[in-house]
Design a protein with these regions (language model features):
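Extracellular/luminal regions of secreted and cell-surface proteins that mediate adhesion/ECM remodeling
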Residues: 319-471
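C-terminal motif of bacterial Sec signal peptides marking the signal peptidase cleavage site
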Residues: 17-19
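Catalytic cores of secreted or luminal carbohydrate-active enzymes
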Residues: 281-333
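Catalytic-core regions of glycoside hydrolase
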Residues: 153-155, 164, 168-302
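Boundary/entry segment of secreted carbohydrate-active catalytic domains
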Residues: 28-73, 77-79
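Aromatic-lined substrate-binding rim segments of carbohydrate-active enzymes
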Residues: 60-118, 129-133, 190, 194
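An active-site-proximal structural segment forming one wall of the substrate-binding cleft
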Residues: 92-109, 126-155, 175-189
C-alpha cells in the first residue's frame, strides 16, 4: 500500500483559504424608528413671544423669565435721550456691556433697539442728527461685537419716534443717503452673522433691491442683502397695518409679496398695536403669521388683541408655532456597529413653525456612551428647513476604530454656533417630540440603545481614530 506524503501549505496560503471559507459578516441591518410629536410649547432659543425689558436700567432675573415664564427672547429699548447732541459716556457703554452679560448668564437672547425718544406721535420729541447717530453707532460697536452671541438680532432704531424710522425731527426718515449710511454703520457694528430689522418695507426695498432666495441668502457671507428683516409694530391694526404698507405709491399687495419673500430668510417680528376685528382675530392672524414667517412677537402689547386670540382659541397655537417648530418624523439606522465600522443614518424632520431658524447653527450627530463622539454635518443648513416642509437627512458615519465597546445612545445636537454658548443646554434646539429630549446633555435622542460591538458585522477601517462623515 502506497503512502501519501502530506505537504505543509505555506502559512499565507492557509490564511487565504480561511478568508475564503469565512466571508465577511454582512453590515448590520438598519432599524426603522418612529417618534411621537408633542403638543406642548417648546421653550427653544431665538423664537417665541418676547417680553419687553429695559436691560440697562431695570435689574432682571433672566433665568426666571426663561425657566418660570418660558421666554427665551427679550426686547430692550436702550434710551439715548440725554445724548442727542453729545457722545455717549463710558458709563453707559459699561452698563450696556454688563447688562448683556446678565442676559448671557440667564440663558436668553435680546432684541435691541436704540432710541432718542418715546414719541409721541405726531409731535415727537427730538432724535439726533445723522452725524451724531453715526458717532454713537461707532461708540457702541465694541460692545455689540463683544456680545453678538446674545443679540438675537437688532431693530434698526435711532431714527425718529420710538426709533421706528418715521417722524424724525432731523428729517432722516425722508433722507435716502442718511438711511443708507446708518444701515451700513449698523451692519458693520454687529458681527457679520447678525441681522437688523427695519420698520417699513419701502426702506427695505430701497436698501436691498429684490429679495434673495433662501439658498442664496444662507450662502452669502456678510452680505447686506441677506441681513435685513422686518418688524411690524402695528400688525393687523388696519388694512395697511397703520401705514406699514401702501407707502410711496406701492400697493399693499405688492409690499406684502415683497415682505413674504424677504422674511423667508430674515427675522420677522414686532407687535400688535390696536384691536381691529375681524382682521386682528384668529383666522387672519394665523394666515399672516404663517405667510410672513413670524419668529417673535410682543407678549405684552396689545392686550386686547392677545386676549381675542385666547378667546378665539389660537393663542396656544401661535405660541407653539412662532419661529421654528422642528419635529422628528422617522429615522432609519443600524443600532449596532463594530469599532471602525459604519453608521448608516437617515432622519426625516418636519417644521411645523411659522419660520425657519434665523441664525446659523450646526447639526451634529452624537454617539454618547463610554466615550462621547460628535460630528457636524457640513452639508446641512437648518436655516433652509422651511416652515411647512419635511426634510430628510441621509448620512454615513465612520465610528473610530478605538471606540470602547459598550452601550451608547445616538442623538442629534443643535447647539448655538457661538463657541461660548455651544455647551449651554438652554441655547440648544429641542425637537417637538415626546421622550426624545435629554435636558442633561441637550441631545435629541434617536435611539437610547446603540451598541458598539466588536462581534458585529460589517467592513471596518482599522486606522480611523475620529468620528467622521463618509463623503
Amino acid at each position: 500500500m502506497s503512502r501519501h506524503r502530506l505537504t505543509a501549505l505555506p502559512l499565507a496560503a492557509l490564511l487565504a483559504l480561511a478568508a475564503c471559507a469565512t466571508p465577511p459578516r454582512p453590515e448590520p441591518t438598519p432599524v426603522a424608528l418612529t417618534f411621537t410629536p408633542s403638543d406642548q410649547n417648546v421653550t427653544n432659543p431665538e423664537r417665541g413671544f418676547f417680553t419687553p425689558v429695559d436691560i440697562v436700567t431695570t435689574p432682571t432675573n433672566f433665568e426666571t423669565l426663561r425657566t418660570a415664564l418660558g421666554y427665551t427672547l427679550v426686547r430692550s429699548y436702550v434710551r439715548l435721550d440725554d445724548y442727542r447732541d453729545q457722545d455717549l459716556p463710558q458709563t453707559l457703554l459699561d452698563d450696556l456691556d454688563h447688562a448683556l452679560g446678565e442676559v448671557r448668564a440667564g440663558g436668553v437672547k435680546v432684541i435691541l433697539r436704540f432710541a432718542y425718544n418715546f414719541g409721541p406721535y405726531p409731535d415727537s420729541e427730538p432724535d439726533a442728527s445723522r452725524e451724531q447717530i453715526l458717532r454713537h453707532i461707532a461708540q457702541l460697536t465694541p460692545v455689540l461685537q463683544a456680545n453678538g452671541d446674545v443679540i438675537a438680532w437688532m431693530e434698526a432704531g435711532f431714527v425718529g419716534a420710538w426709533g421706528e424710522w418715521h417722524t424724525s425731527t432731523h428729517g432722516l426718515h425722508a433722507d435716502p443717503e442718511a438711511k443708507l449710511a446708518i444701515v451700513d454703520a449698523l451692519l458693520a457694528a454687529l458681527p457679520g452673522d447678525r441681522m437688523i430689522q427695519l420698520r417699513y418695507p419701502g426702506d427695505i426695498r430701497f436698501l436691498i433691491g429684490e429679495p434673495l432666495t433662501p439658498e442664496a441668502a444662507v450662502a452669502a457671507t456678510d452680505d447686506a442683502r441677506a441681513r435685513i428683516g422686518h418688524h411690524n409694530d402695528c400688525f393687523l391694526a388696519s388694512d395697511s397695518d397703520q401705514g406699514t404698507y401702501e407707502r410711496e405709491g406701492v400697493t399693499i399687495d405688492e409690499e406684502k409679496a415683497f415682505i413674504e419673500d424677504v422674511t423667508a430668510y430674515t427675522p420677522m417680528g414686532g407687535e400688535t398695536c390696536q384691536n381691529n376685528p375681524p382682521r386682528s382675530e384668529c383666522p387672519i392672524a394665523l394666515e399672516e403669521l404663517a405667510r410672513f414667517h413670524y419668529t417673535e412677537l410682543n407678549a405684552s402689547f396689545n392686550k386686547l388683541v392677545l386676549r381675542s386670540w385666547e378667546q378665539g382659541g389660537c393663542l396656544a397655537e401661535i405660541q407653539k408655532r412662532l419661529g421654528y417648530r422642528l419635529a422628528l418624523e422617522k429615522a432609519s439606522v443600524n443600532t449596532t456597529v463594530r469599532p471602525g465600522g459604519i453608521i448608516d443614518l437617515t432622519v426625516t424632520v418636519r417644521n411645523d413653525g411659522f419660520a425657519a431658524p434665523v441664525n446659523a447653527r450646526p447639526l451634529e450627530v452624537v454617539l454618547d456612551g463610554p466615550s462621547r463622539y460628535n460630528v457636524a454635518l457640513p452639508a446641512v443648513d437648518v436655516r433652509l428647513w422651511a416652515p411647512g416642509q419635511t426634510v430628510t437627512v441621509a448620512v454615513r458615519l465612520r465610528v473610530p476604530a478605538n471606540a470602547p465597546a459598550g452601550e451608547y445612545r445616538l442623538g442629534l445636537w443643535l447647539p448655538d454656533a457661538a463657541p461660548g454658548l455651544r455647551d449651554r443646554l438652554e441655547y440648544a434646539i429641542q425637537f417637538a417630540n415626546v421622550d426624545t429630549w435629554d435636558p442633561e446633555t441637550g441631545l435629541n435622542i434617536l435611539t437610547p440603545t446603540f451598541a458598539v460591538d466588536p462581534q458585529a458585522g460589517g467592513v471596518v477601517e482599522p486606522g480611523t481614530t475620529i468620528f467622521a462623515v463618509i463623503p
